[in-house]
Amino acid sequence: MKNINFIECTLRDGGYHNLWDFDKSLVNEYLQVCKSLELKNLELGFRFPKSEEWLGEYAYTSESTLESLSLDDDFNIGVMINASDFIDEEQLNTATINYTFPFEASNSRIDFIRIATHIKDLNKSLELGQRLLDKGYKIAINIMQAHNLNKKVINEFSQLSKDIELQSIYFAY
């Protein structure tokens, strides 16, 4: 049987309840629990582009935030992004991409990025994924509202995604 890799995203998902404003001691305790459970792939938060309103630290999951944590070297650290934050008038916003991910993966504590997208933005999401792959990040695609997809759309997506090296595809109901 192949090895199964889980993505632990409790902290990122829990941020919907407190706007991603977690106390550092809680996050470090969470990391210790993840280590004891031998969880390797941790999606710690979002990485939203700059915003008019401040959300908690893990809405942005900056490099300085990651450097301040007790991260085990065995952890693969990930963030989630919303594809729509990087698309302006059906074009990718290169400035937003470069502002939000200023470093190559080799100079970042982030190993993987999960791109949440609606099917209408799928082409641009794959293009965004390729741009981030070119920076050395591992990429996963998270298709939202998958219950609305039919077999034809899923087959079209399968064809489109053949040209990009995705780590995983996640269909969110």
Stretches with model-predicted labels:
Residues 1-13:
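N-terminal amphipathic alpha-helix/helix-capping segment at the start of soluble metabolic enzymes
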Residues 10-11, 143, 173:
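Short, histidine-centered active-site or binding-site loop motifs used for metal coordination
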Residues 17:
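Metallocofactor- and cofactor-centric catalytic cores in central/energy metabolism, strongly enriched
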Residues 23-28, 59, 63:
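Short amphipathic alpha-helical segment that frequently serves as the phosphate-/nucleotide-binding helix
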Residues 26-39:
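Alpha-helical scaffold segments that flank or form the walls of functional sites
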Residues 35, 41, 46-162:
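Active-site beta->alpha loop and helix N-cap motifs at the rims of alpha/beta catalytic domains
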Residues 165-173:
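Glycine/Thr-rich beta-alpha phosphate-binding loop at enzyme active sites
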